[in-house]
């Protein structure tokens, strides 16, 4: 995202660079340095174009990727692809020769597209983080909206419109509003490049606000996961506690006349390890349920039906297991099994959300590292009119900004199982193991 005249390493002002270019001089690079820089720039172009093209092709090859949240990743890939296919190639001869040779019309188009793509890339990062924030903090309503692709398309279009409005009108109309162009012949940069007030306002909307937003979203996701983890652990401790749940606690003891038969039956129902998993649970619950004085029907209704018979007392757990009518213990057992199932579901969702948080943290961190140097140097450079920031530091900062477009496609397969599967399907189909779609665990989904 070139935002300044590409001054030579020894020339701090655009005028001196313009004079050197007008005299036919290059930027002062030796032949060896020119070859090295050209090779590095070509490598960045290839990596950016191929990486993001692979992401876009993955959406064509794998229909499982076409979910609402993944459309936002596609939008980001489109922005990054165009950066590598259009913006960087036009800048390479400019930076190597120090002179723009493509005319004023293409210069305007290049500036509009360059600012548009880089700004939309930042806004897409915000949209992706916001989408994951909703998926974690408002899971029910979020899942209900997953089939509404029109909503996703509207959000994607809004990103492009806002990105254009931030810089596009200023690039196209600044010279007419100011009464003429101040750009020297043979150069291509925005008219407002040294307008500190405009740049601080635009930078606030382009970087500082998005960065604070994604930091807030990811911090909220992290705190939500921590809270749910504590709740799950507390629930597990309560379920494994020495006391049974309230609905399974015994009723007051039966009348003294049958105390002995109840005590014996209950005692024989206690050794859970003698039964299988299902039988042990039923047996244990059954012994407790008989205290309710009528949990179901005839054979298991009440301890008073046996007036002290020891043999009847020993048969009680077996009759409970084979009873034809459900007792209160059956409902309690079903509730416990449901709690176990919910615990596994919650554990899976927590694991998935942790992956989401980690992957977003990586993307956001790289976003900050790539954008912060450029934004800060641009503001400082505008404040001192280009005299307080060495040229090579500034150029390094916006090459770092462009490098973000090459890095983003690498991040997707590292955190997303379906992207890895789609990439394998495209690049190494013979290594793709046939798996049912239901077994895929998504990092983003």
UniProtKB/Swiss-Prot annotation:
Residues in compartment: Cytoplasmic: 61-70, 130-156, 218-359, 417-445
Residues in the Extracellular compartment per record: 1-39, 92-108, 178-196, 381-395
Expression (tissue specificity): Expressed predominantly in the CNS, with the greatest expression in the thalamus and caudate nucleus. The various isoforms are mainly coexpressed in brain, but their relative expression level varies in a region-specific manner. Isoform 3 and isoform 7 are highly expressed in the thalamus, caudate nucleus and cerebellum while isoform 5 and isoform 6 show a poor expression. Isoform 5 and isoform 6 show a high expression in the amygdala, substantia nigra, cerebral cortex and hypothalamus. Isoform 7 is not found in hypothalamus or substantia nigra.
SUPFAM superfamilies: Family A G protein-coupled receptor-like (SSF81321)
TM spans (from-to): 40-60, 71-91, 109-129, 157-177, 197-217, 360-380, 396-416
Biased composition (Gly residues): 290-299
Signal sequence residues: none
UniProt-annotated location(s): Cell membrane
Subcellular location, principal: membrane
GO cellular component assignments: dendrite; plasma membrane; presynapse; synapse
Matching Pfam families: 7tm_1
Keywords: Cell membrane, Disulfide bond, G-protein coupled receptor, Glycoprotein, Membrane, Phosphoprotein, Receptor, Transducer, Transmembrane, Transmembrane helix
A GO molecular function held by the record: neurotransmitter receptor activity
UniProt-listed InterPro entries: GPCR_Rhodpsn, GPCR_Rhodpsn_7TM, Histamine_H3_rcpt
Record function comment: The H3 subclass of histamine receptors could mediate the histamine signals in CNS and peripheral nervous system. Signals through the inhibition of adenylate cyclase and displays high constitutive activity (spontaneous activity in the absence of agonist). Agonist stimulation of isoform 3 neither modified adenylate cyclase activity nor induced intracellular calcium mobilization.
More about this protein: Does not bind to cimetidine and tripolidine. Shows modest affinity for thioperamide, imetit, N-alpha-methylhistamine and R(-)-alpha-methylhistamine. Isoform 4 is unable to bind to iodoproxyfan while isoforms 1 and 3 bind it with high affinity.
Family, similarity comment: Belongs to the G-protein coupled receptor 1 family.
Name the UniProt record assigns to this protein: Histamine H3 receptor
Species of provenance: Homo sapiens
Organismal lineage: Eukaryota, Metazoa, Chordata, Craniata, Vertebrata
Protein encoded by which gene: HRH3
